[in-house]
Amino acid sequence: MKDNFSFAATSRNITSSLPFVNLNMSGTNDLIFNCSHKPSDKHLEAIPVLYYLIFVIGFAVNIIVVSLFCCQKGPKKVSSIYIFNLAVADLLLLATLPLWATYYSYRYDWLFGPVMCKVFGSFLTLNMFASIFFITCMSVDRYQSVIYPFLSQRRNPWQASYVVPLVWCMACLSSLPTFYFRDVRTIEYLGVNACVMAFPPEKYAQWSAGIALMKNVLGFIIPLIFIATCYFGIRKHLLKTNSYGKNRITRDQVLKMAAAVVLAFIICWLPFHVLTFLDALSWMGIINSCEVMAVIDLALPFAILLGFTNSCVNPFLYCFVGNRFQQKLRSMFRVPITWLQGKRETMSCRKSSSLREMDTFVS
């Protein structure tokens, strides 16, 4: 028997811990159930267009990354293996966007059945975590390349063979709640069957708040600590070195790229996790304002969309900026790519060990 769900079950749905049930449930914040509101037509018309746009751009740039890796001859670097897995995770995440765009186009009416709801909901969550975890691995690997250049030069690809399965396993474990609870439920006053998180009614608020906080901790706080720590470690180390001329230019480029990784992660994911945290506070009864809850419900789809743009940005941060990117494309397509030509001479000078290792890491 399908339970009846309210609008909050849909607006926070794709990666957050909704919905809530219109039943008498112990331990819930009763105010939440009195704050029902319908989404505007403009709101629901804009979201699918933006989702398809992110899908097209992100899929294209990540396909290039995967193609470059597959066409690369000889042994693969540890950093290249991480970049490849990051691109795969982003591709799989982006591949689900057309379904969610359709979901919004039909006003939160899920047309693909309960099995697809569970599978694609879990698939999205799994690859979202995998993408974030691999970004964290890239930051740690980059830190090691700069701080311990001689040790990092002796890294073998087999070392990544341990890290990569571990990351995917962690992502799978993080998505287990979604796989277990994701299901189709009816929202009567909207006249739709929504793909939602069907938590146990008697512990609904606790589950909703707990899953939201888990996403905050595993998907943002812990990765940000690692990413930011690695950046400041790299910055401190490189600023201590006496670099002149072209070496100084390279050092500044490295620092800018390291800073760009941190800023991109914060800009893309902070809004979603702030709203998710506010959502958890509303379930715990700490936030008791219908206006705040309305903002959460209406803003979350756009915050999730902003998080997805990180999958479009990643190839530019980790692959396309390398000084051998043009060479790799030429090797793959065997045609000159004149539009990528630029001043590369600053990257060809003899560098210090840490700068040289850092430069090849993103190439």
Curated annotation (Swiss-Prot):
Annotated Gene3D superfamilies: Rhodopsin 7-helix transmembrane proteins (1.20.1070.10)
Modified residues (Phosphoserine): 354
Chain residue ranges for the region called Helix VIII: 324-333
Pfam families found in the cross-reference section: 7tm_1 (PF00001)
Cytoplasmic side: 71-80, 141-159, 233-257, 321-363
Family: Belongs to the G-protein coupled receptor 1 family.
Quaternary structure and interacting proteins, as annotated: Interacts with MTUS1.
Protein name (record): Type-2 angiotensin II receptor
Phylogenetic placement of the source organism: Eukaryota, Metazoa, Chordata, Craniata, Vertebrata
